[in-house]
Amino acid sequence: MIKVGINGYGTIGKRVAEAVTLQDDMEIVGIVKTKPTYEMKGALDANYPVFASTKSKISFFEGYGIEVSGVTEDLVEIADIIIDCTPGKLGVNNMDMYKKAGTKAIWQGGEKHAPIGASFNSLTNY
């Protein structure tokens, strides 16, 4: 099974997670959130492990009774691939973390081609 981590479980991330769960050879090993929002219900209902974006946010989640499995770096270490669904201009900041861990990544947010070095658009690539 390919271990998939979703960094940014919001508008895009929750849809990516749904698509991953439909694959026979993939499993969600965790999702990252900056704060507990209404979108967390889907992650909790699906029993996705929840990771806080930073150590300072862990107590915020725990204050709402949400069990936290670690922080972003912890998820990056256990995942085979990270789908970065963070808002535009934030995802590129995670590139060094992914490279350092040797974890492959796909940016599914609003990143431009130049900093990432690759782009994909289903309209033009298929």
Outline where the language-model segments fall.
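N-terminal Rossmann-like NAD(P) cofactor-binding subdomain of oxidoreductases
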Residues: 1-126
